[in-house]
Amino acid sequence: MALLQIAEPGQSAAPHQHRLAVGIDLGTTNSLVAAVRSGVTATLPDENGQHSLPSIVRYTQDGIEVGQVAALSSAQDPKNTIVSVKRFMGRSLTDIQSGEQAFPYQFEASENGLPLFVTPQGQVNPVQVSAEILRPLVERAEKTLGGELQGVVITVPAYFDDAQRQGTKDAASLLGVKVLRLLNEPTAAAIAYGLDSKQEGVIAIYDLGGGTFDISILRLNRGVFEVLATGGDSALGGDDFDHLLQAHMQQVWQLTNLDPQLSRQLLIEARRVKEALTDASDVEASLTLADGTVLKQVVTKAEFDNLISALVKKTIASCRRTLRDAGVTADEVLETVMVGGSTRVPLVREQVEAFFGKAPLTSIDPDRVVAIGAAIQADILVGNKPESELLLLDVIPLSLGIETMGGLVEKVVSRNTTIPVARAQEFTTFKDGQTAMAFHVVQGERELVDDCRSLARFTLKGIPPLAAGAAHIRVTFQVDADGLLSVTAMEKSTGVQSSIQVKPSFGLSDTEIATMLKDSMKHAKEDISRRMLAEQQVEAARVLESLNAALAKDGDLLTSDERQQIDAVMAQLAEIARGDDADAIKQAIEVLDEHTQDFAAKRMDNSIRVAFKGQSIDNI
């Protein structure tokens, strides 16, 4: 029996209008949409009862197919069926083509070097393909919820850089959908479990999806979600398990020179076998060739475990490094949350349990937990839970800084700093009369610019022509909740400023972040030595330039012998500064300082005489 809601005319029966917002897990393999309805958070099914939408888009002469329809045709038309498009987001065509994996697609490069898929519908980029995946999810949500969405929260891997995050936002913008927040996938899982289980303490989020692996160490305390550290691999996931099994099956069947269609069929069968091995000790695989021949083989769990063992060990090694970054041990981790369909693989669960010493949490479907967390966050951000005390603190994966003289990096925002964040630091001019300053924004953990990743360059003009070191330029780094960076430089006395929003033309390569972190640890001692040398060389150059200016102005205060002695010591410093002995340079600077103290005193006396010339003692 239907219940009637009674209210005064013109008034709502509810205390406030419920705003429609959803969380979307835009995954590499599958995507989902979830919402909070009547206090219950759940993923939304399509008209066929399917919750997950395969992240597959097929372009034909007649139109565009998305999801399961596209998946069914992928084996017959691999060239025009784009799968795992998330792996192409924010990457250059050169980066993609230089990778180990071959793709069946026809590519062309855009003006800025980004990949374009050549399809029967024309050229499309990864952002447009992603928008096609988002479209049915948004339509499903609006149909189910009965109205237009006022915002969405979309999840991204923690390792996505600025370009990849911006590309995700742009995909939603193509549909006219407002993005309330981009949310790291592991953090979304923490929200789902944090609100359900009221956990307090250190939690590990082990997220192994189709294309990426993320490990996040979080501290949950009284509604505050703080990410202590993140790690992982942006090019390791269940897809790699599939490709290894595909290669194994191909070798057993002694198949060579596969055409794209047969290769796709074999990959689909490998994925089916992988999923079946979750609950079975062995599975029969089969493949039908073009001539009707049916090939069969039995794949055992032991064989599959042996194939993927090295990759699973890589994820455990990432866990170990990230725990070290967070400053905690495995024993301090209260719970481990499993996220992503690939965590259903028995070997993965076994290895994770062995490393952390406890069975991982799987009470929420690992395929749906990210979407559920995103939906909870969307419900809060859209204003449906004004009483909520949930506070979310993400972190940036790599330090951000500015290039200084000598090719050194001055870190402004350190790695694993919680975001959103704003940090400011003051810099000054190097030369007398300097009226402009070039800024080079870099990303990385190394001490020298050459070993870090360049993000952007911009110039501040209109600096007052003062003596070296007299101007004060305040540089502010702001990282918003989506991980996008804005840098502003302002000269304090005039207020003149310049700024830039960092949107790199393409993202990091698959393993670059992990490599950068490993290199920073491997070369730490060497980098410190190189930094100390560069700092002394910069100081030597500054001292010599300053002294040359002083000699040009007041050199007549010196006797011929005094001038020759200073010139000789200066030449000695210049020669030593070209070497690689930081201590020797420092010592040479000190020697020059000793030899110029009398000159400095004479300059001071002369300045005082000039200042007081013609004045009586009564006027002083």
Swiss-Prot record:
Gene3D superfamilies, A to Z: 1.20.1270.10, 3.30.420.40, Actin, Chain A, domain 4 (3.90.640.10), Substrate Binding Domain Of DNAk, Chain A, domain 1 (2.60.34.10)
Classification via PROSITE patterns: HSP70_1 (PS00297), HSP70_2 (PS00329)
UniProt entry keywords in alphabetical sequence: ATP-binding, Chaperone, Nucleotide-binding
Domain of life assignment: Bacteria
One Gene Ontology MF term: ATP binding
Any one of the GO BP annotations: iron-sulfur cluster assembly
InterPro entries membership: ATPase_NBD, Heat_shock_70_CS, HSP70_C_sf, HSP70_peptide-bd_sf, Hsp_70_fam, ISC_FeS_clus_asmbl_HscA
Record bears the keyword Repressor: no
Role, per record: Chaperone involved in the maturation of iron-sulfur cluster-containing proteins. Has a low intrinsic ATPase activity which is markedly stimulated by HscB.
Family: Belongs to the heat shock protein 70 family.
PANTHER family: HEAT SHOCK PROTEIN 70KDA
Name this protein carries in UniProt: Chaperone protein HscA homolog
